[in-house]
Amino acid sequence: SNISGQHFPADLCPKDIAYRCLSTAASDILAMGGLPTSYLLSISHPKPTDEWFNLFSDGLKSFNSRYDVELTGGDLTFGDLNIAVCFFGKAQEKILRRDSACEDDDIFISNILGRGHHGLVNYKNLDQNFFLKPELPINLTKKLNPFINACIDVSDGFLKDLGRICSASKKGAEINFSNSFVLSDLDDLIRGDDYVLCFTAHKKNRKIILEISKNVHRVGKIISGDAIKVFDESKKELSFVDFGWDSFKN
């Protein structure tokens, strides 16, 4: 469910609202090792107009064409602006879960962190596609699927979502921070809205994973226990007040 003013700016063009809502929903399918195929769409709107729905439809068509998916049904009602999307997908070789990380697994991200936040700040000016049109790593997912143990997409913040893998797998994590895998600074670890994949894999697969794409970064490893520890390049442990976005607090 995407609420105006919370999940997207209230003044956003309807075409961009549509594309972003579909992207963020389809990302969950990729995080489980699937490929998105179709979706249901429910819309509540306080002042529906033909112009708004024509622009919104343009966004749907653009996404559908880009990722070869289709709208198969839904609902429309009066109310505050809210876009609810339910995606369906087709499993690949492996269905990926959050509870399958193993001790000593490498931790990877499929692209750098911080682009979503940067795109939100600049959505009226520069780099708007980072926020408005998150790029779904469809082809990358196909190639990586056989090598992944556990996976999640980064929506609420890298450390927050990594914590969900750790909690489900009953493990901890050690992250070695580097500016090479963030757009701006340390806070990119917790800002969210990136919609990249965070995944773990056996060390024996490290070389082939890094050869699959230059955008993939190894950022740490899974450890015993339940703590998530972050170290800077001098091996000093870093601390955070929060690990990311909380829909019921933020």
Protein language model features and the residues they cover:
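Helix-biased detector of long, well-ordered alpha-helical tracts
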Residues: S1-N250
